[in-house]
Amino acid sequence: MLSKHTIILVVGLVSLVESARSQETGGRPAQNVGSGSGATNDTNGANNPVNPMLTIDLQNYFVPSPEGYSGRIGDQGLLRVSVPIDEFGLHQFVRVILPIDRTATEQGGPNTGVGDLTVYDLVLFQAHGTTIGAGPLIAAPTARGFAYGSGKWQAGAAGIVIKPFDWGLLGVLVNDEHTFSGNNSGPVGQETTVQPIIHYNFHHGFYLRSTGVWTFNSYYHVQDIPLGFGVGKVWKRSNGDLVNLYIEPQYSVYRSGVLSPKWQIFAGATFKFPVGRRRTEH
């Protein structure tokens, strides 16, 4: 599962933001999201990956038996910090992603290590109620070893299309990256990920979700197409902060390559904080 250092780091980040927000608003507690259009906007806003709020995600993929490692466990934690910015007259969304892997090994039990640090900057546009974004992506070789990352610098592009409806959200997030420099013995190749985003809202902040990430890696010859079906719950504080808890089992309808999971459990907590800029509806 997630390392204690990761949990401590995220709790510290959330506590710092909450402390600053509480001084402004008196520290009122979180409340259930109600019903109606306002509640729909709150639930959609909590699930929209480019909603212009400071966002901290603590997420985890639990893989009971990765392909090629029968009877062993793979586990990947993800720390994501996302910040909306306005520079050069453009609405942008910067996201930093740090994986913490607990990976099955051939030598015995699982090892834990940090993966490659990824940063991307999406420039966002609005068209007929749909948010469209695209921008550069770069990944630094911060991984502990080849079991956790490529050992090379990677660059590419990221893009998103997402649209809210009265019933929920529909969209897709795409990343494409290529290795270009670093450890000469490291893998050279390309990885493309496609993440369909489907959410269906109920009353009081409850919702259904499907957000499995499809992965295509040319070096490891990995192809993995999971379909997820999960549930989540959103709370809104009176100061505008959003808290989102969710769990989503995912089953791979197609898979090939080492470490490609047959099924996995994705779970997480997302915290969103207004940052003093005008909130645009997506």
Predicted features by range, described:
Residues 2, 22-25:
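Acidic, Pro/Ser/Gly/Ala-rich intrinsically disordered segments
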Residues 4-15:
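Bacterial N-terminal signal peptides
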Residues 16-22:
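Sec/Tat signal peptide C-region and signal peptidase I cleavage site
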Residues 24-282:
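Transmembrane beta-barrel domains of Gram-negative outer membranes and organellar outer membranes
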